[in-house]
Amino acid sequence: MFEPVELNNNAIIKVIGIGGGGGNAVEYMVQEHIEGVEFFAINTDAQALRKIEVEQTIQIGSDITKGLGAGANPEIGRRAAEEDSDNLKSILKDADMVFIASGMGGGTGTGAAPIIAKISKKLGILTVAVVTKPFNFEGKKRMISAEQGVSELSKYVDSLIIIPNDKLIKVLSKGISLLDAFNTANNVLKGAVQGIAELITKPGLMNVDFADVRTVMSEMGYAMMGTGIASGDERAKEASKIAISSPLLEDINLSGAKGVLVNITSGLNMKLDEFETIGNTIRSFSSDNATVVIGTSLDTNMNDSLRVTIVATGIGTYNDIKHNNNTENHTSKHVPKNLENLQTKESPKYNNPKQHIYDTFNQQGITNKEMNYLDIPAFLRKKHK
């Protein structure tokens, strides 16, 4: 039986974007006006920090890099973070939860993210990382660097969510713009932060406090996160389907998830049977002994829409996932069988995952200069101004 819990408004959530890509991800979230969260951009590149529209920026490693960046060298990124560890500790110390956003494969993000995560964990902060892995065409060296960075990062975070950039090619519709494709990846981080922030800061019929969030996400290893929005008579089923599919994430098997955190956001018109539908979706993949925390957030701006955010944790270590997946795409077979055939009106871009953006590049005659833009080691490539 679910019991209402007193709302806790005191939890401090910080989102730390590391490197050029992580900074871009944080800037995107600032522009999306996520409430109840503090945002920081950390970089070795002074020029990148001057251009970014994030209020709180921190330059690291100025003595090592002279403000010129890490030159795609993770060792430089690591040393830069260690050089400014006291400063980093000061911005983290009062947080209850920290999200780390970074692209893996470059210099600053790959090298500094594990150091910052380590500092956060030593301070007793619930630490969650959302990172990307590079496109295959960015080269074997960058991919190896990314794998090493993720493996090191996984030692110091409570939960880890990975977005392989190649999924943007395999999943999204043919002809989608580059900006929209990268913004779709950015929405994974936004969904996780927004869903958890709303759970503990917005009133609802079933309130959740930060202790519940910590129970589900602490020391859980690999995680899956998804958000779905739908409207109409089947909105609960459709939103759950979208949330649980998470086609942009590293391929994982949800069966046996040890922790599940769910936020349902709607207006005042949510029905009991809709709540049951979402609950049955959770039961379809979680372990019988899983810790399940469900909260609702009221938002009158949702009108007829309903949003479901699901964070499933305790799915295994990063090395377990890497060993099981290799390069094969298993996404569809990991959706619970009772949801596999459901078609949704809200997610037409997922209907044909075999369409390739790369085909569009070839058809449109993308130049070498434009392809070099894709090779920028960033979480999201900054749009040209």
From Swiss-Prot:
Keywords: Cell cycle, Cell division, Cytoplasm, GTP-binding, Nucleotide-binding, Septation
Signal peptide: none
GO biological process: division septum assembly; FtsZ-dependent cytokinesis; protein polymerization
Subcellular location: Cytoplasm
GO molecular function, one term: GTP binding
InterPro entries associated with the record: Cell_div_FtsZ, Cell_div_FtsZ_CS, FtsZ/CetZ, FtsZ_C, Tub_FtsZ_C, Tubulin/FtsZ-like_C, Tubulin/FtsZ_2-layer-sand-dom, Tubulin/FtsZ_GTPase_sf
A cellular component term, taken from the record's GO annotations: cell division site
Top-level lineage group: Bacteria
PROSITE patterns tied to this protein: FTSZ_1, FTSZ_2
Residues that coordinate or bind GTP: G20, G21, G22, G23, N24, G107, T108, G109, E138, R142, N186
Function: Essential cell division protein that forms a contractile ring structure (Z ring) at the future cell division site. The regulation of the ring assembly controls the timing and the location of cell division. One of the functions of the FtsZ ring is to recruit other cell division proteins to the septum to produce a new cell wall between the dividing cells. Binds GTP and shows GTPase activity.
HAMAP family tied to this protein: FtsZ
Entry's family note: Belongs to the FtsZ family.
Assembly behavior: Homodimer. Polymerizes to form a dynamic ring structure in a strictly GTP-dependent manner. Interacts directly with several other division proteins.
Protein name, entry field: Cell division protein FtsZ
Species per Swiss-Prot/TrEMBL record: Buchnera aphidicola subsp. Baizongia pistaciae (strain Bp)
Organism phylogeny: Bacteria, Pseudomonadati, Pseudomonadota, Gammaproteobacteria, Enterobacterales
Gene: ftsZ
